[in-house]
Amino acid sequence: IAAGSLGGMSAMHEQTRGLNYIHHINQPHWFAAGGEEDREEFGVRIARELEAKRDELGEDKVAAFIAEPVQGAGGVIVPPDSYWPEIRRICEERDILLIMDEVICGFGRTGNWFGCETYDLKPDLMTFAKAVTNGYIPLGGVMVGNKVADVLLNHGGEFAHGLTYSGHPVACAAGLATLNILRDSKVIEHASSNIAPHFQARLAELRDHRIVGEVRGLGMFAAVELVRDKSSRERLAPDSQAAVFCRDTANDNGLMVRQTGDAMIMAPPLICNTAEIDILVDKLGEALDQTAAHYGVG
């Protein structure tokens, strides 16, 4: 219930009814909500909602702010450059703990080992999972910064964080093996320097497609937002039907993509080569052509 309440997926909130002590501010999704507003001004304005929410609730009611560096399942929402510096300022000035959810961004997805490094952030707590074992064995964890650890260890006794399967030797062995491969083979550095730039450049070519409203991405993941009209950002079809059609068409053509809302999401393996990236983008382009034809957009 707590995890569902923390996330931004409304279906989960409806299912669990949510927890009344968890509050949300708007996401820094400029394409969806920015209108004609300058992108960087939008980023600052949305970040300052944290400050306003803290004042609304009272300083003794706000323990922490938790977010992904880049929202993954929400649609690869890359925040404006102004967003995270303003969040960092607010957290530091208002003594709000910063918790980074690195489950998706962690271990190379944004071009660095962790997304917080990409945005020059030093979180007080950081969650991780997924790529720590390359997905072969379930493993997740929480990294605790000195600010929190010092209080727990020096003023509260033991750091009681054990769970039934904590430190499972098989899972931890898989994690260590994965980390060794990432480090010794320089997988992240190679992807960041050689593959990610090609991936983002090829996807950028789709911006001129007649049903593409926005192409956004960072490192080795990206999203393509579908629209009927580029100027008004009118959706191609209600209830994300067009995006579902595009996803299914891409799958039929041999390309696996994820659909979230009206966005097509891609997160190729870090070990891809440029030829495979070309296949990905070409197949997505074909799916976009078929989707445009299906909905009569010439």
Question: Which residue stretches match the model-derived regions?
Answer:
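Conserved N-terminal phosphate-binding loop of PLP-dependent enzymes in the Aspartate aminotransferase
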Residues: 1-298
